[in-house]
Curated annotation (Swiss-Prot):
Chain residues that bind Zn(2+): 8, 22, 25
Subcellular location as annotated: Cytoplasm
Protein name: DNA-directed RNA polymerase subunit Rpo12
Manner of cofactor binding, per the entry note: Binds 1 zinc ion.
NCBIfam families linked: PRK00398.1-3
Keywords: Cytoplasm, DNA-directed RNA polymerase, Metal-binding, Nucleotidyltransferase, Transcription, Transferase, Zinc
Classification via Gene3D superfamilies: RNA polymerase ii, chain L
UniProt record similarity statement: Belongs to the archaeal Rpo12/eukaryotic RPC10 RNA polymerase subunit family.
Superkingdom, natural source: Archaea
């Protein structure tokens, strides 16, 4: 799962680091990335 650090804005994956901390700056607030999927909904 991909996250973005709120301080340094770098991409972080928690699987490779193993904790809830940015490996670049040490900040503990990570924002979850949204998926790039676009959903179509029919409204009738």
């Amino acid at each position: 799962m991909s996250y973005k650090c709120s301080r340094c804005k770098r991409d972080v994956t928690l699987d490779e680091y193993g904790g809830v901390r940015c490996p670049y700056c040490g900040h503990r607030v990570l924002l979850k990335e949204r998926g790039g999927d676009v959903k179509e909904v029919n409204v009738e």
